[in-house]
């Protein structure tokens, strides 16, 4: 669908499936400010769940509910945003990659801090009508990340509170001086409560209540009932859980923070013939950056001079250094090998590949998975419901029985039903899991993508660029009618001289001939026709040109997995050229691993059936669909999806419709490819296909941990409430069980951050074409 606003402005819906739309804008003055205006305007449309504008590629991605709004309403809002005056653009910072002021990983770190402390500031995170925080009421984390337990202020206070509480017990037993005992208990209560009461009161003043509010009420109630020791014990135990949560959160984020070291603070640039050291933030597009052996690249660029082997393991997760030379694109954070490089800067430090990747992840965090939505749906109304239930228990019990007994039980029920462990059950797992995956070159865009990835049962693999490396080479030339190998290649190269098609590149690389044909015309779906030395020459697929006496040889080429093209001059066949895009060396291993894991594997390709079948056999794939156009792939993926959760793996460009049609789109080799990263839900940054089963297994394990955490949290609440109501457990016992549960949930969630790197480079199988 295309909407023309005027002669210059045009909106094109690139993909629209599963409540996710991607719109390409042309003719816009698409800068950072306009991105803010688009996000603000489109975000106000009823039914729009999240929106993100990308100035770099002039595209907008929208998640919306089809039942509430349609494509026309969204496009209309984008058009309206294009006319918003600059002075009327909202004052908040754009979430677009071209206007980032935080560090490369800082925004995702900030997000995880907000998520795990219950403070959400991004759009769609907190509807305006909410009055309840899902998570514990915690203060903002300290600027300096604690690396040891004793560095956490809340744990230091908890320890001091515990010492005072222990001293009160010793004093009561050895020296029954009650003023001293009460003083120690009161001091223990004050120190422990200082970790959560101030923030709870602050949030209460803002009209929000959370678990900290429940604990504050319970502590005050215990004091009112004369149970100072119970109140002090509650404050001590809850302060421990608060401190442990902060420590676990910091520990989880430290893995992400380590990525900051990938980008050096300084870079050497060549200005006016002199090498000058400047801050990385001062680099400009067009600068000539000098990178010496052992140094990291400060930003993205293109090599102008020099050759080396780059270590990109920290970015792509691949351990084998990549050989690069003049004209090759290089990325921020890569480590230079032995050579000295002169690199032309193509992106600023704030807009390099690492910054864009982290930014996109941060922007997509508003998309919660099913487990997080379930936890939120339970936790948000649970807190005020608990307060109402506790008030009813206290009131009814006071009328029918002993008021002191029932008020105390109401306070215990208040604490027993607190959903603190439930609220952190999923976020801590998501942050740990996504952070671990990103360190190995797997970009997972938010909790929703992580959970969906964990439910996938079928995988559709595109052939070109996914199963193969998209680097075809000429592997055989058959001749006839007296033509030579060089003559056949020369005619083919003449027709392909001005083409950038991968097959053309392969043919041109196989010959030294440089003469280009004239009057070259493309015949869609067939081949090329032109004139060379006054004679008519043609190049095309079998069927358009008659293979004649080379039919058997052409069949042999196709059975070997090669694409065969025929060459003809003056209606006389000269020969056949076999061009093969080799399977990735790890393809068969990956397919075998997927099938062992219970995944249904299907190959999709636009190539002919014979070639597709041959390559599929080499890879071990049984289900093959060939001669597909992009829209055919999308339709086929939709059919697979109707049967079971399906992931589509492609390059993210030609496969955009299929990626959008799947439950989950996975882009292969997405490093430096904006469209691939924007289109897919998961991006494999490197070229090693073994990251695919690694990501699937990691997500499946992470989802299991989420389910375990949510199940345990709900079970504990379900068990504790009746025990508290009937007086079987007291306040201290309930708090102890709750905080022990929270420790288990945190520790279990952190396990999602464990992922093993790939073991060495893939083995290269020996493949030859039959003679």
From Swiss-Prot:
The keyword ATP-binding applies. Keywords: ATP-binding, Cell membrane, Magnesium, Membrane, Metal-binding, Nucleotide-binding, Translocase, Transmembrane, Transmembrane helix. Residues 19-86 form the HMA domain. Residues 122-143 are annotated as: Disordered. One of its GO terms (cellular component) is membrane. InterPro entries: ATPase_P-typ_cyto_dom_N, ATPase_P-typ_P_site, ATPase_P-typ_TM_dom_sf, ATPase_P-typ_transduc_dom_A_sf, Cation_Transport_ATPase_IB, HAD-like_sf, HAD_sf, HMA_dom. It is found in: Cell membrane. The chain crosses the membrane at residues 72-92, 163-183, 209-229, 330-350, 387-407, 411-431, 657-677, 716-736. One of its GO terms (biological process) is transmembrane transport. Its EC number is 7.2.2.-. The keyword Transmembrane applies. It is a multi-pass membrane protein. The active site is at 462 (4-aspartylphosphate intermediate). Mg(2+) binds at residues 651, 655. It catalyses: ATP + H2O = ADP + phosphate + H(+). GO terms for molecular function: ATP binding; ATP hydrolysis activity; ATPase-coupled monoatomic cation transmembrane transporter activity; cadmium ion transmembrane transporter activity; metal ion binding. It holds the Pfam family E1-E2_ATPase. It comes from the Bacteria. PANTHER family: CADMIUM/ZINC-TRANSPORTING ATPASE HMA2-RELATED, CADMIUM_ZINC-TRANSPORTING ATPASE HMA4-RELATED. Belongs to the cation transport ATPase (P-type) (TC 3.A.3) family. Type IB subfamily. This is Probable cation-transporting ATPase G. It comes from Mycobacterium tuberculosis (strain ATCC 25618 / H37Rv). The lineage of its organism: Bacteria, Bacillati, Actinomycetota, Actinomycetes, Mycobacteriales. The gene is ctpG.
């Amino acid at each position: 669908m295309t909407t023309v606003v005027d002669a210059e402005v045009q909106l094109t819906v690139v993909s629209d499936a599963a409540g996710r739309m991607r719109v390409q804008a042309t003719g816009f003055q698409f800068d950072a400010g306009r991105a803010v205006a688009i996000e603000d305007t489109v975000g106000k449309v009823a039914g729009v769940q999240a929106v993100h504008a990308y100035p770099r590629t002039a595209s907008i991605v929208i998640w919306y509910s089809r039942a509430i709004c349609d494509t026309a309403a969204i496009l209309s809002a984008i058009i309206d945003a294009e006319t918003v005056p600059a002075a009327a653009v909202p004052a908040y910072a754009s979430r677009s990659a071209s206007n980032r002021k935080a560090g490369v990983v800082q925004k995702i770190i900030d997000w995880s801090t907000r998520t795990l402390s219950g403070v959400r500031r991004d759009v769609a995170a907190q509807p305006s009508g909410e009055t309840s925080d899902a998570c514990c009421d915690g203060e903002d984390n300290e600027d300096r990340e604690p690396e040891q337990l004793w560095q956490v202020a809340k744990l230091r206070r908890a320890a001091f509170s515990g010492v005072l509480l222990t001293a009160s017990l010793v004093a009561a037993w050895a020296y029954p001086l009650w003023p001293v005992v009460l003083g120690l208990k009161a001091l223990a209560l004050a120190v422990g409560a200082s970790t959560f009461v101030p923030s709870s009161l602050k949030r209460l003043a803002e009209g929000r209540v959370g678990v900290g509010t429940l604990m504050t009420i319970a502590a005050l109630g215990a004091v009112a009932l004369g149970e100072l020791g119970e109140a002090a014990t509650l404050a001590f135990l809850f302060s421990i859980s608060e401190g442990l949560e902060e420590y676990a959160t910091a520990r989880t984020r430290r893995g992400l923070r380590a990525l900051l070291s990938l980008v050096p603070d300084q870079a050497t640039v060549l200005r006016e013939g002199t090498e000058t050291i400047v801050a990385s933030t001062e680099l400009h597009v067009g600068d000539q950056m000098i990178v010496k052996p052992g140094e990291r690249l400060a930003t993205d660029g293109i090599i102008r001079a020099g050759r080396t082997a780059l270590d990109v393991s920290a970015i792509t997760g691949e351990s084998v250094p990549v050989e690069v030379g003049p004209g090759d694109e290089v990325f921020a954070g890569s480590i230079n090998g032995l050579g000295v490089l002169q690199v032309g800067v193509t992106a600023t430090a704030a807009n390099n590949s690492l910054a864009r990747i982290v930014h996109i992840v941060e922007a997509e965090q508003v998309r919660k998975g099913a487990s997080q939505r379930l936890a939120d749906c339970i936790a948000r109304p649970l807190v005020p419901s608990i307060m109402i239930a506790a008030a009813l228990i206290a009131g009814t019990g006071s009328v029918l029985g002993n008021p002191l007994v029932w008020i105390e039980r109401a306070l215990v029920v208040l604490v027993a039903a607190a959903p603190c462990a439930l609220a952190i059950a999923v976020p801590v797992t998501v942050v740990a899991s996504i952070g671990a995956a990103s360190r190995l070159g797997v970009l997972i865009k938010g909790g929703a993508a992580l959970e969906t990835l964990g439910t996938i049962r079928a995988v559709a693999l595109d052939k070109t660029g996914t199963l193969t490396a998209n680097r075809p080479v000429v592997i055989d030339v058959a001749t006839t009618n007296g033509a030579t190998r060089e003559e056949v290649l020369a005619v083919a190269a003449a027709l392909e001289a001005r083409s950038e098609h991968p097959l053309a590149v392969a043919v041109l690389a196989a010959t030294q001939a440089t003469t280009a044909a004239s009057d070259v015309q493309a015949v869609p779906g067939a081949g090329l026709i032109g004139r060379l030395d006054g004679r008519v020459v043609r190049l095309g697929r079998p069927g358009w040109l008659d293979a004649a006496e080379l039919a058997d040889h052409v069949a042999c080429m196709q059975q070997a997995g090669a694409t065969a093209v025929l060459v003809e001059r003056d209606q006389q066949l000269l020969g056949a050229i076999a061009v093969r895009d080799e399977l990735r060396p790890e393809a068969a291993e990956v397919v075998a691993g997927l099938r062992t894991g219970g995944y249904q594997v299907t190959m999709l390709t636009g190539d002919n059936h014979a070639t597709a079948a041959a390559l599929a056999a080499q890879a071990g794939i049984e289900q093959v669909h060939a001669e597909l156009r992009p829209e055919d792939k999308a339709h086929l993926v939709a059919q697979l999806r109707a049967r079971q959760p399906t992931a589509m793996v492609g390059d993210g460009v030609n496969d955009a419709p299929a990626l959008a049609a799947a439950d989950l789109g996975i882009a292969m080799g997405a490093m430096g490819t904006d469209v691939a990263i924007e289109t897919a839900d998961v991006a494999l940054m490197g070229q090693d296909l073994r990251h695919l089963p690694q990501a699937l297994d990691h997500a499946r394990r992470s989802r299991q941990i989420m389910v375990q955490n949510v199940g345990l949290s709900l079970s504990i609440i379900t068990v504790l409430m009746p025990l508290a109501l009937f007086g079987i457990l007291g306040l201290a016992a309930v708090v102890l069980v709750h905080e022990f549960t929270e420790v288990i949930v945190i520790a279990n969630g952190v396990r999602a951050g464990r992922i093993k790197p790939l073991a060495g480079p893939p083995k290269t199988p020996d493949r030859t074409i039959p003679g």
